[in-house]
Amino acid sequence: MQTPPVKDGPRINEDIRVPRVLLIDHNGEKQGEMPISAALEAAEEAGLDLVEIVPNANPPVCKILDYGKFKFQEQKKKNEARKRQKIVELKEIKLRPNIDIHDYDVKAKSMHRFFEEGDKVKVTLRFRGREMAHPELGMKLLLKVKADFDEIAKVEYEPRMEGRQMIMILAPR
């Protein structure tokens, strides 16, 4: 014996296999608890479908409505929700330990913009040559970045050395 394929979405009309349902008519008015046969008749009279809205309730809540229109509205809601989602990107700002004040300000302005857009920022501090002898300068600079953006960003990944570079990740608050 083969089981019928499982449909996604709510059960409609004859697919509803419970003896009694709580019916809501097409105007949104509660009609009360009734046998499934009476609910199906009421839906047929209205020329609409009987759709199971809350299957887990006792008795299940069914509503008389146009199923095609209902599916369309649900799809529209899903699409709207998808549009509103913001994908958080990881932007990278590269610095050097002996960066000039103006250059730092330019980088800080970019970081500010990234945080306003809701993106995370990876601050990478590259050491070259003899700069490796003074990692404390790099740590000092990253702590300055951390302090400057303390109000609008939180540290997600504390500053630490990875090879010839020091990395810190900040996320908007």
UniProtKB/Swiss-Prot annotation:
Swiss-Prot/TrEMBL keywords: Cytoplasm, Initiation factor, Protein biosynthesis
One GO CC term on file: membrane
InterPro entries associated with the record: T_IF-3_C_sf, T_IF-3_N_sf, Translation_initiation_fac3_CS, Translation_initiation_fac_3, Translation_initiation_fac_3_C, Translation_initiation_fac_3_N
Lineage: superkingdom: Bacteria
Subunit structure: Monomer.
Name this protein carries in UniProt: Translation initiation factor IF-3
Compartments where found: Cytoplasm
Family classification: Belongs to the IF-3 family.
Record organism: Caulobacter sp. (strain K31)
SUPFAM superfamilies found in the cross-reference section: Translation initiation factor IF3, C-terminal domain, Translation initiation factor IF3, N-terminal domain
Gene designation: infC
Pfam family, one: IF3_C
NCBIfam families for this protein: infC (TIGR00168)
GO MF term list: ribosome binding; translation initiation factor activity
